[in-house]
């Protein structure tokens, strides 16, 4: 069971308030997952967005609808990205440019994302192929690696050249409430979670 009694999940471009000032939105994804959960937190005269969805035409359109309708035409004040996966960071660059706001994320996630984007269009390195073969990958797995290598950046709008670094245990204000950063790894190298004790 979902812990919030919010009624039905939001449709594309819609939002559901799950806590005072915290809006739950869903952005479309292709494939089995179908959607990614993203968040908008009331922040003064605008919204702090947490995660953005992938860089696709459908996701961009869903955000345009959300900006106009669900978020009431208010500006985005900052974009917080929890980790480097394209379904979370894909439109961060687009959004920060559109609203002239800062990208906030952990250092390792930002730098690793930039590194992976730099490989876009390149062929799989022979060193990588040898490494994975020695690690026991079969020919199908190696071919999948070769075919998919260099595609990471295709789902990510160009990132800004600078960002505001998030650190584990750091606290800051969003919309008059104190939020704490809690980092972890496993799903990604330095994933950031946001925690607000008041909510």
Model-derived features with residue positions:
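N-terminal presequences and immediately downstream first alpha-helices
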Residues: 1-7
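Conserved beta-strand hairpin/beta-sheet module of binuclear metal-dependent hydrolase folds
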Residues: 12-74, 194-199
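Divalent metal-coordination and catalytic microenvironments
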Residues: 21, 41, 51, 83, ...
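Conserved HGGG/HGGXW glycine-rich cap/lid loop of the alpha/beta-hydrolase fold
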Residues: 26-29, 88, 183
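Metallo-beta-lactamase
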Residues: 47-57, 149-157, 161-164, 171-173, ...
């Amino acid at each position: 069971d979902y812990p919030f009694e919010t009624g039905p999940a939001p449709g594309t471009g819609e939002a559901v308030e799950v806590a005072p000032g915290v809006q739950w939105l869903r952005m479309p994804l292709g494939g089995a997952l179908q959607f990614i959960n993203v968040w908008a937190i009331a922040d003064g005269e605008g919204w702090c967005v947490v995660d953005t969805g992938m860089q696709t035409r459908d996701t961009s359109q869903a955000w345009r609808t959300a900006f106009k309708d669900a978020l009431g035409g208010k500006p985005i004040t900052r974009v917080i990205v929890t980790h480097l996966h394209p379904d979370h960071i894909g439109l961060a660059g687009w959004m920060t440019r559109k609203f002239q706001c800062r990208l906030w994320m952990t250092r390792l996630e930002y730098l690793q994302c930039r590194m992976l984007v730099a490989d876009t269009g390149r062929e799989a390195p022979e060193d990588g192929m040898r490494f994975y073969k020695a690690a026991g990958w079969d020919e199908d797995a190696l071919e999948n690696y070769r075919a998919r290598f260099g595609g990471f950046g295709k789902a990510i709008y160009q990132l800004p050249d600078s960002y505001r670094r998030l650190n584990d245990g750091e606290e800051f204000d969003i919309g008059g409430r104190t939020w704490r950063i809690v980092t972890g790894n496993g799903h990604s190298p330095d994933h950031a979670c946001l925690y607000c004790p008041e909510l």
